[in-house]
Design a protein with these regions (language model features):
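Positively charged n-region of N-terminal signal peptides that target proteins for export
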Residues: 1-4
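Bacterial N-terminal signal peptides
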Residues: 7-16
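Ligand-binding loop in jelly-roll beta-barrel domains
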Residues: 68, 95-118
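Short acidic-glycine-tyrosine-enriched beta hairpin
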Residues: 78-95
Length: 127
């Protein structure tokens, strides 16, 4: 009984921590889920110059820029990268945890397509 309760508590704690890093949860004023199914989730992200997100994580994703913007991403190890985008830019982003900051003079507006991993039992489809 004691072992079951401990396992249940750990599961809840881990689940809460994992959910807390979902950008739609950590920054709901900026990230809007516009489509979600078993394969993908599409997020509409908007912010203003000087805005900074809470630390969050994304699975493998594709970013599509709808506006020009300049952004700083800071990773958990303290390293950071600065990227500038123009409307129509498309970029693959490997799974990562970061804090995002709009360091430019224009609003950010992007669509993020997040890829969900197939279940372990999924069989590849032949082309």
């Amino acid at each position: 009984m004691r072992r079951t309760n401990l396992a249940s508590c750990l599961f809840v704690l881990v689940s809460a921590t994992a959910g807390a890093q979902d950008p739609a949860v950590t920054d709901p004023d900026r990230y809007k889920v516009i489509l979600e199914n078993e394969h993908t989730r599409v997020l509409d992200y908007k912010d203003h110059p000087g805005d900074r997100t809470t630390q969050h994580k994304h699975p493998d994703s594709v970013l599509y820029a709808l506006s020009p913007f300049k952004r700083k991403l800071t990773f958990p190890d303290g390293k950071s990268v600065i990227k500038a985008f123009n409307p129509g830019d498309v970029m693959f982003i490997p799974a990562q945890t970061h804090i995002g900051e709009n360091i430019g003079k224009t609003d950010t507006h992007v669509l993020l397509v997040e890829f969900k991993k197939p279940p372990p039992s999924a069989k590849p489809v032949n082309p």
